[in-house]
Each structure stands twice: as C-alpha cells, then as structure tokens.
C-alpha cells in the first residue's frame, strides 16, 4: 500500500483540519458550474464532438483501459478519434504530441501508456490548456472527427458532448469518504448527476446520490496476461512462464500488490525494488541468469528505450458492458446529423476536405476519388469500406 492510499484510509487531526478546505472546494465547483450554466462564464465549443472520460476518485487503474476500449470501439465504427489531456508542469505552455519517445517527465505515465497501446491508430496530445491542445491536435490531424479528453472532469471551460465518469468502489470502499485534499474523492457524488453515464469498477454496490436517470455500466476485470515489451505481439500466460527463471523488477509505489499478483499467478520470482522516481537503464538488469524479467504496466513507460527482449509486462484485461458502446454511438449520431460538422471532416488518407453528398449519404474525397459511406448516422472513415469512384463518375 502506498502513502496516499494509507492517508486516504484514515481520519486524523490533519484530515479534520483539511475538511473545511474540502467543503470550500465543493462549494467553489458548484458556483463555477452555475456560472457556466448561466453563461456568465464562457465555455469553448470545439468543431468536433468531445467525450470526457474521468474518474470521481483521484486515481483509478481502469481509466486507461477504458479509454483504450472506447477508442477501439470508435475506430471499429469508422470514426477517427484523438486523445487530449492535461500536461505536466514542464510542458506548461505548449501543446505537444505524445509518442513512445517522449520524455517521461514531460508526458507522464498515463499519456505514454496510451501512446504505446494506440500508436499509429490514435494521436495523443497534452498541454496545460486543453482547448489549445485540442486545436493543435485537430490542426495537425485533420482526419480526427471525435476527441476523447482523458481528464477534464472539472474543466468546465471545455464543452463536452458526452461525459463518462468512473466510480471505482475499490478505492471508495477503502477510503475515508472525504473530498480532496482530505480524501480520495475529487468531487461529491452529487456531481454524477451532471454526467451522461457512470462506469463502475470494483464491487457492485449502490452509488449514493446518483439518481435513477443516470445510466450505470460496469467494467469487469478478466484474466491477467503478459506481453513482451520489445515485441508486444508476443503474449504469454502465467502457465507458460511458470518454469522460467524469473526476476520481478519494479519501482511502482504499490509494490506489494504487484508481488501479490505474481504470487497469485503461482509464479516464483526474485524481486528487485527501486525507488519510485528511479529511471531504468540497461545496467539495472545485469542478471544474466534471468530468462524472464517481469515489470508492472506502470513501469513499462520507463523501459521503452532498453530493447531487452527478456522484459515482459503484466497486463490486466477488462470487459465493459456493451451498452456503453450503444449509448455513445447514439449521442454521436445526433451530433453527425449536423451538416456543418460533416462539411469540416477530412479524408484520413490525404487529409484533404470531403464533399458531403446528402442524397447518397457519402463523403467524397476528390483527390483520392473515394466515397466514404455514412451508415446509421456515423461517417465510416475506413479505406476498406470506401467506394472507389470510377473515372467516368463526375465529382461536383
């Protein structure tokens, strides 16, 4: 258990001192929401739909896998999503694209993990001002037609078309029930009434103050498996690694949880523990006798440049209720009914403009002579699904 989890579990004199600060924070957020709702404070509308995915608690291990599943769902439906997020202090001013080569101190673990898992399929951009980040991403990736904000629950300046709030009951059950800075909650449960859907992780339990009008879906852990960091297409089960000489290396603050997981998987390992702020170098892995080196997912971002094929990553798989896909696509269909939105979409191949043909329900790329279909209200921006225009067909 790391220090923050221990802090959130207790109520001490320090928590009692911070409790009035928590109440002031909630009051401040309520006033801000009221001012934005009354248009006294001005929010910014982006040209493409925005989906905010964030957690009501300070941390949630399911947020990154949930975002990845939403991205894959959108791409399978023919959409071209991009991800925006808040930057670290070191990149306070400028929006930046995140790749697996981005410095950890600039990009942060979560953004690097997203860039690693979604490389070449979904751009990831971060920066201090989410509005400017979104504009920079859309300017660079003109083919993107929907944005996912991987935080921003409390950034009311950013208009959102759909909001997914994660409620991790495993965090709440072990917490003291207080709002930051006195506890793990980032806002009161009443905030959930302003979201579109709630995704619940952990134990299935009634969430207070949510109301009956907010749909709740569940994200459920499935099996754990390992993938090779240098060759992620290679995967292995615990049984396949059981007879290997294994060293487990981590600088994750939740060290014991990682080792307990390996023990639960019946793997015998030799542990090596580094400090939380440690940056791995090749010299940290001198053990020639090790056939396999296991690391937790959070530490994978610190090993991208090592190119050691012995390094395998422990990954937890999750399943999300199918109803979440249905309700998100329903909302996006409503947005794409606006011809103004269809008129600004770009070809995913040449990045050039598309011509909206309402009578044919197609988006025409004049340069590549391709017609992308609009099916069930969703523009399907997939080359394999596009109709190749014959030479004799005139494009107007």
Swiss-Prot record:
Bridged cysteine pairs (disulfide): none
UniProt region (UPF0434), positions on chain: 337-396
Keyword Nucleotide-binding on entry: yes
Pathway: Glycolipid biosynthesis; lipid IV(A) biosynthesis; lipid IV(A) from (3R)-3-hydroxytetradecanoyl-[acyl-carrier-protein] and UDP-N-acetyl-alpha-D-glucosamine: step 6/6
A GO CC annotation given for this chain: plasma membrane
Chain positions covered by the region annotation Tetraacyldisaccharide 4'-kinase: 1-336
The protein's Enzyme Commission number: 2.7.1.130
Keywords, alphabetical: ATP-binding, Kinase, Lipid A biosynthesis, Lipid biosynthesis, Lipid metabolism, Nucleotide-binding, Transferase
Biological role: Transfers the gamma-phosphate of ATP to the 4'-position of a tetraacyldisaccharide 1-phosphate intermediate (termed DS-1-P) to form tetraacyldisaccharide 1,4'-bis-phosphate (lipid IVA).
Annotated protein name in UniProt: Tetraacyldisaccharide 4'-kinase
Organism: Nitrosomonas eutropha (strain DSM 101675 / C91 / Nm57)
């Amino acid at each position: 258990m790391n220090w923050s989890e221990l802090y959130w579990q207790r109520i001490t004199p320090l928590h009692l001192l911070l409790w009035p600060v928590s109440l002031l924070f909630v009051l401040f957020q309520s006033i801000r929401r009221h001012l934005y709702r009354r248009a006294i404070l001005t929010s910014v509308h982006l040209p493409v739909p925005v989906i905010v995915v964030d957690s009501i608690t300070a941390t949630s291990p399911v947020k990154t896998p949930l975002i990845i599943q939403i991205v894959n769902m959108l791409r399978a439906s023919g959409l071209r999503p991009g991800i925006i997020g808040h930057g670290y202090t070191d990149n306070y001013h400028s929006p930046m694209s995140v790749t697996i080569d981005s410095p950890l101190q600039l990009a942060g673990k979560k953004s690097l993990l997203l860039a690693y898992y979604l490389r070449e399929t979904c751009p990831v951009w971060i920066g201090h001002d989410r509005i400017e980040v979104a504009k920079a991403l859309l300017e660079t990736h003109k083919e993107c037609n929907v944005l996912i904000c991987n935080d921003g629950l409390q950034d009311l300046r950013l208009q959102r078309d759909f909001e997914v709030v994660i409620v991790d009951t495993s965090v709440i059950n072990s917490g003291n029930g207080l709002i930051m800075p006195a506890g793990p909650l980032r806002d009161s449960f009443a905030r959930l009434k302003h979201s579109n859907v709630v995704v619940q992780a952990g134990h299935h339990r009634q969430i207070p103050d949510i109301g009956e009008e907010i749909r709740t879906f569940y994200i459920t852990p499935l099996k754990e498996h390992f993938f090779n960091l240098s060759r992620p297409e290679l995967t292995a089960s615990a049984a396949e690694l059981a007879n290997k000489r294994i060293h487990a290396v981590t600088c994750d603050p939740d060290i014991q949880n990682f080792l307990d997981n390996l023990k639960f998987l019946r793997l015998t390992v030799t542990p090596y523990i580094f400090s939380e702020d440690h940056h791995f170098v090749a010299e940290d892995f001198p053990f020639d006798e090790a056939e396999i080196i296991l690391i937790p997912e959070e530490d994978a971002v610190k090993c991208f440049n090592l190119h050691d094929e012995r390094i395998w990553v422990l990954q937890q798989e999750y399943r999300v209720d199918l109803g979440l896909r249905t309700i998100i696509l329903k909302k996006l269909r409503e947005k794409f009914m606006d011809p103004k939105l269809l008129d600004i979409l770009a070809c995913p191949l040449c990045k050039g403009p598309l011509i909206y043909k309402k009578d044919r329900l197609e988006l025409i790329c004049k340069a590549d002579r391709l017609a992308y279909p609009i099916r069930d209200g969703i523009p399907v921006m997939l080359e394999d699904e596009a109709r190749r225009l014959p030479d004799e067909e005139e494009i107007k």
